[in-house]
């Protein structure tokens, strides 16, 4: 994950001081891209320990179309707590948009099922896209989508994916985002009998919060270790039937975890 450390250093070297919605302050750059060949290993940051349980359960939660944190709490995942209301609801965030995007005539579009059908039946399409950025429902969401738009691409029997992330918390959020979408590519590829290709991450406002600087320098002082390998133990009937127990990360030997405050 040398690319991740290079991005951190780039933000430190070239970033502009900006104010932000949370009032914390950031160093920010605009427009950055990283490419991860998923054949080379699973792109899980090794210069600090990442909480894999949270990454997997959050993705499974998205895929169920869920927008209440009850499932996450049942599985000891607290990453959405700060934004939930007193009933645990977040409004029409990722899961709702992925699985039940509302249309003007009262229907709902299941974007995940749609792209799966496209990958199986029309893999050369340039429209294999999922969007979470529903401008008609942004004001109802506890947090507007940061990872907003992703596209799949099939070539030579391999499935690749590019994500556009409009806002990126490089220290806390980005390691989760990279691993989550890499996991999704593996799952979609398995369901479509494809090999994995590249995960391409594209960032808009790409920033380090002012209260993450010490933690950033600590990570930059550490040498990246070899990437682990993802093992999916079974092939479920559908993309929606995976369970936490289906995934194993082999050979993950990270440096110790590094804590940092969340900007809300």
From Swiss-Prot:
Superkingdom: Bacteria
InterPro entries listed in its UniProt record: Thymidate_synth/dCMP_Mease, Thymidate_synth/dCMP_Mease_dom, Thymidate_synth/dCMP_Mease_sf, Thymidylate_synthase, Thymidylate_synthase_AS
GO cellular component, one term: cytosol
Binding-site positions, dUMP: 21, 126-127, 166-169, 177, 207-209
Active-site residues from the entry: 146
PROSITE patterns listed in its UniProt record: THYMIDYLATE_SYNTHASE
Alphabetical GO biological process terms: dTMP biosynthetic process; dTTP biosynthetic process; methylation
Keywords, in A-Z order: Cytoplasm, Methyltransferase, Nucleotide biosynthesis, Transferase
Purpose: Catalyzes the reductive methylation of 2'-deoxyuridine-5'-monophosphate (dUMP) to 2'-deoxythymidine-5'-monophosphate (dTMP) while utilizing 5,10-methylenetetrahydrofolate (mTHF) as the methyl donor and reductant in the reaction, yielding dihydrofolate (DHF) as a by-product. This enzymatic reaction provides an intracellular de novo source of dTMP, an essential precursor for DNA biosynthesis.
Subunit structure: Homodimer.
Protein name per UniProt: Thymidylate synthase
Organism: Shigella flexneri
The gene coding this protein: thyA
């Amino acid at each position: 994950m040398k690319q991740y450390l290079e991005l951190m250093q780039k933000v430190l070297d070239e970033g502009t001081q900006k104010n932000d919605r949370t009032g914390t302050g950031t160093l920010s750059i605009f427009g950055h891209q990283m490419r991860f060949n998923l054949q080379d290993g699973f792109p899980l940051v090794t210069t600090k320990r990442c909480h894999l349980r949270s990454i997997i359960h959050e993705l499974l939660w998205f895929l169920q179309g869920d927008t209440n944190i009850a499932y996450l709490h049942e599985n000891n995942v607290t990453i959405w707590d700060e934004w939930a209301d007193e009933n645990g609801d977040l409004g029409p965030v990722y899961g709702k948009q992925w699985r039940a995007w509302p249309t003007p005539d009262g229907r709902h579009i299941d974007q995940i099922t749609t792209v799966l059908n496209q990958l199986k039946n029309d893999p050369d399409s340039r429209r294999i896209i999922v969007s979470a950025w529903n401008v008609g429902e942004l004001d109802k969401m506890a947090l507007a989508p940061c990872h907003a738009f992703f596209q799949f691409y099939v070539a030579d029997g391999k499935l690749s994916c590019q994500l556009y992330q409009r806002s990126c918390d490089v220290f806390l959020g980005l390691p989760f985002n990279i691993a989550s979408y890499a996991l999704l590519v593996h799952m979609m590829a398995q369901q479509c009998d494809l090999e994995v290709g590249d995960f391409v991450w594209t960032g808009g406002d790409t920033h380090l919060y002012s209260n993450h600087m010490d933690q950033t320098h600590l990570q930059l002082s550490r040498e990246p270790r070899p990437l682990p390998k993802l093992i999916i133990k079974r092939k479920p009937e559908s993309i929606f039937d995976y369970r936490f127990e289906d995934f194993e990360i082999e050979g993950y030997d990270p440096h110790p975890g590094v804590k940092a405050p969340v900007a809300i």
